[in-house]
Amino acid sequence: CAVSREHALAGKKKLKITDLYGQTLMMVQTGDSEVNDRLRAYLQREHQQIWIEDTPRFYDISVFNRCAETGNVLLTLECWKDVHPGLITIPVEWDYRIPYGLLYAQNPPEDVRRFVEAVRAAMR
């Protein structure tokens, strides 16, 4: 999760789910991600002390800015830890992992196609 550098949780090395009690967790809306849908259902069922705010499917700078400005907590990926200078990323102790892949255009140029094929071959 990401929080503003001034957030009460910002000094923690790792978060427990109970650290999120009383917080608003920003995450993609239902239907955008199977893993996030499972996490949302779990939080709504077992941890109702955490409020959830829907974000667009693809985070843009406005989502990161909103997190920094509101003091909300943003569900984010470790690989995005340096995307916004006003936020820090802290891992959470839970059993949810987001699979990550390659993002590329539907009709990519030839060099991108060759790269994707090389990655596919390496993954086999």
What spans do the regions from the language model cover?
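Short, charged, surface-exposed secondary-structure boundary motifs
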Residues: A10-K13, R38, H84-L87
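Beta-alpha-beta core module
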Residues: I61-E110
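Hydrophobic/proline-rich hinge and linker segments of small-molecule sensing/allosteric domains
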Residues: C1-T30, R97-P108, R120
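Short beta-strand-to-loop elements that line the ligand-binding cleft
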Residues: V28, Q48-D60
